[in-house]
Amino acid sequence: MPSNKIILEVITDEKHVPETIRWEAPQIMEKGECKSIALALWDGKENNTLRMDVWTKDMTTDEMKKFLLQSIITFCDTYERATSDSALADKIKQFIINIAKEEKVI
């Protein structure tokens, strides 16, 4: 059966604080570095979301605000594609866009 891999590597300092985050998608020959990862996994047995959030020590508060608000907006797009509930997706997205404008991150 075909499979694809996404490789995440977190390099830490001696206190285990992330310094560098690298990612690689070998099947499409893409790789790079990033400052933050927000990974959500669905545990079907527990009927619950598992989260893994990692960010480097040089990521600024403003970058984190922008990253999180943009992530929520993209989750709205995912929600709409998965459920066809455009009304709720649009409502949440507009709410987050308003917050992002207030915070001056968009």
What residues fall within each predicted segment?
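Short amphipathic alpha-helical patches
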Residues: 16, 60-65, 95-103
